[in-house]
């Protein structure tokens, strides 16, 4: 299955997908340190090569990936949801990015969606 990894972080979910036999075709991650880890894991062979979208997820267009992606995965920011966070929930600035994940899922229309997040959700 071809995966589009949103909020990819340092690639733990991508590695899990690789173990399941998924092929990541693109990752979206704004954090520079996380992107550096993704590149390092590609360079050392832990992860297969894939392009990394480094701009804000609000600028990512999922439509070109329609028909090319079987699963959209990701864990949108949970700081506003978790018990250690602000308590503003899905309306919070960071956790509100769930709506971008929803938008991209609608653009891509994958067969499957895999979301990881706080149990407080």
For each predicted feature, which ranges?
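Conserved active-site and SAM-binding loop architecture
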Residues: 1-121
